[in-house]
Amino acid sequence: STELSMNVTCLATPAESLAGRLLRSDRERYGIIKGVTDREYYTNSFHVPVYYHLPALKKIDIEAPYHALTNAGHISYVELDGDPTKNLAAFERVVRHMKEAGIGYGSINHPVDRDPVCGYNGIINDTCPCCGRSDADGIPFERIRRITGYLVGTLDKWNDAKRAEERDRVKHEVDSNFGD
């Protein structure tokens, strides 16, 4: 900043642990306020809340203008419900739309699951499509998800607030064109 004779930047911080901790503090002080403190986490940065049902391309359009304002770092993402290689044309459409909208750092999240018993890698819902076993059989499936732009290990290592946020994420259908 010329006015302060200092370098000033703005970071769209993920504040992953703060998203739950600050919420708990605010609940203690202000109680549960509908639409503010009634979930298990705060939406971080300038993201559209993960539970808002809107087309992926619209989400990108809403978040993109903030990338130009956060010169110290930013990310926007689209969450998919399956394997993006099943619809590469739609995947490319999202990537191109991110670029055209001005997204500086974009991510397309999708599930990566592994059955540690039979070694299957792919999308696992309630039962492994390879061997047919379920989580209830005693050894849980490894469910790797992206947080703050990184694959950070299995969900069981995430804090409660971030697990709740991941559970609430609107998953856009891989077999769609992601809407306009």
Explain the meaning of each model-derived region.
Residues 1-180:
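Long, C-terminal-biased catalytic regions of enzyme "large/alpha" subunits
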